[in-house]
């Protein structure tokens, strides 16, 4: 079935009509059992549950109202999202607030969206209701425990009709930036279908932009994050690919599960952030893979954070004995503001690593080098599904090839803006290029906030502009420094710049596991790590480390999507709140 721009519930209705008894979604719950408890919905079952829940939602909300989804990863989460769209209500996928702790992010989103409905589950409702306060002049939102409803009953004829008039906004995707003022990206139907078309072109173009029979989506990524949401919830429906899903907890408990799922599902397509590739490489044992073969994997997308060359090599080497084809690994670039996807290399090519002169990168020049000691960067390919330009963020003038600037994006996939933040929307989504080159529109352009460059037509990414370390007047990418550290210590680490006496100094924070060893052995091991890291950073980046902080795993603050909160690291360091292993 070809998908033209219609609606997500409309496509689901078609699938329920033409392939009612085919498997749609399978969720494996590893929290109920270590071996996993499976629940499967066919297309007709998924559609029936969607219709029944949508009918309930219409009793509590009107077109354009917001429904917050604060529920565990489950099939009910998927049903909650599609039912919101079916009812003409703007869906807001979120993570569950942490029990026993005040969750500023959840409070901020409630205040920002003034929801009419909160969709949750009986297992977490006590946590959720703490945040359900009516906004001034409004009623408190209706709290619906989806798992307590009978959604398998025959839908009434009235429930089959779509909402009268759909809002321009389908859903709000809250970014994982500031906890106090999270920004809700407004995604429209046009954005979603444009990005779906781009995704199918880039990842299934060799099959005529259609998933071949036998294809499967495999995902453990959280539904509240843009990559997990599109991969695990949107793509299966629009592309008609059955999905096998689990939760982030299922993966983190035992990373080998992800690789086993890839091997046991045909033509598997999956995605994960860079750290997950490291974790799977280190935590998957040969006995976990006994009798399994990865030769049939269609694609493993590495995205959400900058892809590290050392991670790719480690992952490919680890699973080569199990027939993993390096060409299946797809480093990819995207963000919620572009719906999710922006760039990847063409299918049929293994990841490409290019060395650049480390002395020139801090001065904004990207020059390829063949010599040892270059800075390795991953290519994201030639972008051809949307427009990408490298621009001077201060002047709005395009930068020539081989010159570092801000990555700007233009296409129908670029979202409407930030919910109720007109100034931030104007600043981020309405940028204009001064004296644009031929074939380049003046605007509007999305300012990604990412620094990068084009070399021989290919896109390379340096990192977040706001995270750049400016030491002695030169720009250094924290991602590059962290990649150097991880060649010595593969755990999580953070490179930050801290102001002292009017100058920026480099501080590295490294998570290390404690071992069963004597105090003398521990001191020797920690001293070795410090010496090796200090030497490697000096050699690779020409920088001296002012302070190297060794901490226990879990000490470095991260976002809900696993990215390092560097600004929070700086504050923790200033307040001397890191507990040092070598204190």
From Swiss-Prot:
Pfam families listed in its UniProt record: AMP-binding, AMP-dom_DIP2-like
Subcellular location as annotated: Cell membrane
GO BP terms, alphabetized: Actinobacterium-type cell wall biogenesis; fatty acid biosynthetic process
Main location: membrane
GO cellular component: plasma membrane
Protein keywords: Cell membrane, Fatty acid metabolism, Ligase, Lipid metabolism, Membrane, Transmembrane, Transmembrane helix
Start and end residues of each stretch annotated as Disordered: 353-375
Database matches in InterPro entries: AMP-bd_C, AMP-bd_C_sf, AMP-dep_synth/lig_dom, ANL_N_sf, FAAL/FAAC
Membrane topology, record value: Multi-pass membrane protein
CDD domains noted in UniProt: FAAL (cd05931)
TM region(s), chain numbering: 77-97, 109-129, 229-249
EC number: 6.2.1.-
Homology family: Belongs to the ATP-dependent AMP-binding enzyme family.
Protein name per UniProt: Putative fatty-acid--CoA ligase fadD25
Native organism: Mycobacterium tuberculosis (strain CDC 1551 / Oshkosh)
Gene that encodes the chain: fadD25
